[in-house]
Amino acid sequence: MDTNAILKRADELFDDDRAQEAGAYLEKMAEQAVSEERYGTAMSLFNELTGYYRNTGNLDAAWRCVDEIVRLLDLLDLWGTADAATAMLNIATVYKAAGDPAAALAIYKKCEPVFISENVGDRRLAGLYNNICVTALETGRRDDALYYAEKAWRIAERVHMDGESLELVRKNYNAAKQAAVNV
C-alpha cells in the first residue's frame, strides 16, 4: 500500500471535480490500511479525510477521523513528533470549523515547540503562525495575533515566499496590525 500513490489518485479525483468520489476512495483506503495494520498510511489518510470532511461541512465524519487519528497517535506512540503536531494542526482546524476557535488556538500553540524542535521547515512553521494569527484575531487576542503575524512575516521575507502563500501572510499581517491599532 503506497501512501503517495493513494494521495496522488485522490488529488487527481479532486482536480477532476470528483470530490465525493475522492472522499469515498480515501475512506476505503484508510479502512483498508487499518485492517492491514499499516497505521502510518492510515494516519496520513485520516488526516486527509479530516480536511475533506471539514471542507464539505461534514463535521461528524471529521470528528470520527479525529478520534481515529488520536487512537493511531497513541498506538504508534508518536506524541511529540512532527507527525503528531501536523495531525494536531488538522484537529485544531476541526475545532475551529465547529465554532471553538479558543480550543483551536490552544492546540495550535502546542504545535509550535514541536515544529521548532523537529525542524519541520520554514514554510510549515510560517503556515502554523499564520493559523495562530487568524485564530487569535477571531478570539480577540490582538497581541497574540500581531506577535504571530510578525513571526510569519519574518519567515516569509527570509525564504522569499511568493504567490498565494505570501499574499495570505501579508493579508493576515495587515489585519493583525490594524486590529492592534484599533484597541
Residue ranges and their predicted role:
Residues 1, 40-41, 61, 80-83, ...:
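Structural signature of alpha-solenoid helical repeat junctions
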Residues 27-32, 70-75, 109-117, 151-158:
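Amphipathic alpha-helical segments of tetratricopeptide repeats
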Residues 35-38, 75-79, 117-121, 158-162:
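Short coil/turn linkers that connect adjacent helices within long alpha-helical scaffolds
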Residues 4, 43-44, 83-86, 126-127, ...:
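Residue register of alpha-helical TPR repeats
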